From Swiss-Prot:
Organism: Fervidobacterium nodosum (strain ATCC 35602 / DSM 5306 / Rt17-B1)
Sorted UniProt keywords: Cytoplasm, Elongation factor, Protein biosynthesis
Identification of the protein by name: Elongation factor Ts
UniProt family annotation: Belongs to the EF-Ts family.
Keyword flag Translocase: no
Keyword Ligase among UniProt keywords: no
Bilayer-crossing regions: none
HAMAP family reported for this sequence: EF_Ts
GO molecular function annotation: translation elongation factor activity
Length: 197
């Protein structure tokens, strides 16, 4: 199948990838846009992984206050250079993440930040729920691990599904931005406040 300039342009607009990357992905996918996007995402994630070790000393503090004035978020989003911190793409990513935090109430940025005593308490609760199930101990441990994964997905920002698109996690969104912008990006911390909490 012949890849037209219009097809390349459309794919670039949808993904933010480079022109030759788009053309090659379309050729590899025989003109199938969804396949081409998947190919680019896989390559983009590889690019993001290469940039993950770089230091992020620049960035922005992004604020979001819900329209009713009862929920507010402060988010520290870091990148490598001040130039990137001033771009619309970076600011838009920060705003999306801050709105997500307001809506979904994560407690930690990553699973590594969850205190050990909280994890033990959760495991204890799950064991108590399953003690009369009659299942073997190793099966119960597997179930507990599965429940713990769900706990992380509910409470850790990077593992949560994005509030406005359940097909991607916050981590996926950040990796897509890294692939598009070309710099490492990290959420350092956030504070979510709500009247009465």
């Amino acid at each position: 199948m012949e890849i037209s300039a219009q097809m390349v342009k459309e794919l670039r607009e949808r993904t933010g990838a480079g022109m030759m990357d788009c053309k090659n992905a379309l050729a590899e996918a025989n003109g199938d846009f969804e396949k081409a996007i998947e190919i680019l995402r896989k390559k983009g994630l590889a690019k993001a992984a290469k940039k993950a070790g770089r230091e992020t000393k620049e960035g922005l503090i992004i604020s979001y206050v819900h329209h009713n004035g009862k929920i507010g978020v402060l988010l520290e989003l870091n990148c490598e250079t001040d130039f990137v911190a001033r771009t619309d793409d970076f600011k838009e990513l920060g705003n999306k993440i801050a709105m997500h935090i307001a809506a979904m109430s994560p407690r930690w940025v990553t699973r590594e930040e969850v205190p050990a005593d909280v994890i033990e308490k959760e495991k204890e609760i799950y064991r108590e729920q399953l003690k009369d199930s009659g299942k073997p101990a190793q099966v119960i441990e597997k179930i507990i691990e599965g429940k713990l994964e769900s706990f992380y997905q509910d409470n850790c920002l990077l593992e949560q599904k994005f509030a406005l698109d359940q097909n991607v996690t916050i981590k996926d969104m950040i990796q897509q931005a890294i692939a598009k912008i070309g710099e490492n990006i990290q959420v350092s911390r956030f504070v979510r406040m709500q009247i009465g909490e």
